[in-house]
Amino acid sequence: MICVGNIAVGGTGKTPHTEYLIKLLQNEGINVATLSRGYKRKSKGYILATAESSVQKIGDEPYQIKSKFPDIRVAVDENRCHGIEQLLTLKNPAVDAVLLDDAFQHRHVKAGMNILLTDYHRLLCDDALLPAGRLREPACGKNRAQIVIVTKCPDDIKPIDFNIITKRLNLYPYQQLYFSRFRYGSLMPLFPEKAKGRITCTGDEQVLLVTGIASPAPLVEEVKSYTPSVSLLEFGDHHDFGEKDLLLIEKQFNLLKGNNRLIITTEKDATRLKNHPNLNETLKRNI
């Protein structure tokens, strides 16, 4: 079992790192499964995802993973021990490794490898316990990790920054430290059959950036590197978009000037928007 998690609330990039690990393990011929509690899903108990599973049934992050890796087992269960037991009973093929999403503080599970993520812009050594800060437990909890990854590093990070952060984190010899950064992919229409024309940014677009993630700042910076005209419409992490939210998105989109307008959202948010019954044609053409 491999646990990927953090000790701070908010986004550190668990899902992209989980997807990266899936690819690494698959390349080694390992039959991998993922298990999470399925945060904000509208169901309970153990569910093994299928191609027909909805985002409401399993949650946005498991839905995203199952969509990108249809051949692996993706399960949700608020009882991690029970979920692991169920996955390990599966055959043809049997599960060789289980990736546990956000289970770093689940003390009933003893993972063979614990990977702890910490945001470059808010290192755990600079943080404080809730409610003064964002830590769920004291920073010394990092000592349970065999691997620590500093995520969301800027492209221009310098060697001296590596040295400074290494000293400040003050890890033990048994712990390995890595640094990672996001590499954003190309823009993709949420509804290809309805998209109008090109979907590239050339610098003259008016963009409405819709996010429902914990830390949108790096994404905002990325989008602004393509076009300066970016309006941010920010919702809470894992936000369950309602009819009023869609009306607000359309209203903000209509406030953009000119004909070269675009709505950009994240891959995770797209899972919650795509099958929404109240998503109208205007939004479908422009997201």
Where do the protein language model's features map onto the residues?
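Walker A (P-loop) phosphate-binding motif
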Residues: 1-51, 155-156
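Residue-level signal for inorganic ion chemistry
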Residues: 15, 65, 101, 145, ...
